[in-house]
């Protein structure tokens, strides 16, 4: 693939897409390397009440104003200091667009994998499934449907920061299921993992769509370490870099990051930003959104926010680790080597590890 500059027609704001095929590691097209690392979202220490699971149909808020304040502070730093802007602001008021090649690949894997996972879990008297970054729960429903069909009770807790999406999906899931008790936790992955650790029974920690590991190496390891504890079964979906560098990379790259729906999702953060700041900082016509690719170490895609042609900050970085890199992460956190289930066309993989085995 050769480098190119392209402009995609859109509104509020315009979208400008940059891509370069062979920059050096850490270098971005059209500007100096970005060295500002994301600051971690402030965590309120879990108190006893925060660790109590939500009841069926409930969405329990354990972060509330902490998230609102930290998002506003992070946005202000990005505007004034040019620091990296984390992903929270994108998810707060916007639903993930869905329909990507990652979704297609994971769905195909889960159709085959879910019966095997179910057979391993069904004998446990208490089963908890915590999904980190649950979206609309469509993919996880492939597994939940089996519990319902066999009349085996389990508890399913969605962990997400989008309150509207949480309430909507918890309500819909409880209309669908009788044996699967569905609830929601309005909080970060760290909150979800702390709550999971406090529950009795067999816990399944799952995160699909590359959500858990799609971060810089240190944060990905932190998420994985928190997931691979006690007797947890871990189910993680992650797309490898060859999806973007192989024969169909050009097409898959566009399908992942440059669709009309995805563009709407990214632009939605600007509206959320205006609401958080209490004024119209992101004015239509003044801001453009570009992208930059680092092809290795690992493969990375970042969005660049320009104000009147000048780069102001970068955001929503997406990392793609290969099989060996992910396997090494499991080894680093002291977890068993994962099973790897593949969908070659989309380079999606689902990694499964049972932390205590059978």
Predicted regions and their residues:
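A conserved beta-strand element that flanks and buttresses the S-adenosyl-L-methionine
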Residues: 206-207
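Core SAM-dependent methyltransferase catalytic element
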Residues: 346-358
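Conserved SAM/SAH-binding loop
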Residues: 185-192
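A short, conserved alpha-helix within the catalytic core of class I
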Residues: 213-229
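Rossmann-like AdoMet
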Residues: 2-130, 137-185, 197-202, 347
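Short "lid" loop at the C-terminus of a central beta-strand within the Rossmann-like core
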Residues: 190, 239-245, 293
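Conserved beta-strand signature within the Rossmann-like core of class I S-adenosyl-L-methionine
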Residues: 228-243
């Amino acid at each position: 693939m050769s480098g190119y500059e392209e402009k995609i027609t859109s509104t509020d704001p315009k979208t400008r897409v940059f891509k370069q095929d062979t920059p050096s590691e850490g270098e971005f097209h059209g500007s100096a390397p970005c060295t500002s690392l994301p600051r971690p979202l402030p965590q309120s220490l879990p108190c006893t009440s925060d660790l109590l699971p939500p009841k069926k149909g409930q969405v329990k808020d354990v972060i509330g104003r902490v998230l609102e304040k930290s998002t506003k502070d992070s946005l202000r730093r990005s505007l004034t200091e040019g620091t990296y802007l984390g992903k929270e602001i994108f998810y707060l008021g916007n639903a993930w667009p869905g329909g990507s090649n990652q979704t297609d690949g994971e769905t195909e894997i889960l159709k085959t994998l879910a019966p095997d996972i179910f057979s391993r879990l069904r004998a446990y008297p208490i089963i908890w499934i915590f999904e980190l970054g649950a979206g609309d729960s469509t993919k996880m429903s492939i597994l939940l449907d089996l519990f319902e069909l066999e009349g085996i009770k389990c508890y399913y807790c969605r962990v997400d920061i989008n309150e509207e999406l949480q309430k909507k999906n918890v309500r819909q899931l409880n209309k669908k299921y009788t044996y699967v008790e569905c609830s929601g936790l309005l909080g970060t992955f760290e909150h979800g993992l702390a709550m999971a650790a406090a529950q009795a029974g067999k816990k399944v920690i799952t995160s699909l769509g590359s959500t858990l590991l799609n971060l810089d190496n240190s944060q990905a390891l932190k998420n994985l370490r928190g997931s691979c504890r006690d007797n947890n079964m871990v189910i993680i979906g992650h797309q490898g870099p060859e999806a973007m560098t192989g024969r169909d990379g050009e097409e898959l790259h566009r399908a992942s990051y440059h669709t009309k729906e995805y563009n709407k999702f990214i632009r939605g953060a600007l509206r959320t930003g205006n609401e958080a700041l209490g004024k119209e900082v992101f004015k239509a016509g003044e801001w453009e959104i570009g992208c930059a690719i680092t092809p290795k170490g690992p493969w990375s895609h970042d969005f660049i926010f320009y104000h009147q042609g000048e780069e102001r900050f970068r955001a929503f970085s997406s990392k793609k680790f290969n099989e060996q890199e992910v396997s090494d992460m499991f080894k680093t956190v002291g977890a068993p080597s994962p099973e790897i289930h593949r969908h070659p066309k989309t380079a999606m993989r689902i990694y499964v590890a049972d932390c205590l085995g059978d």
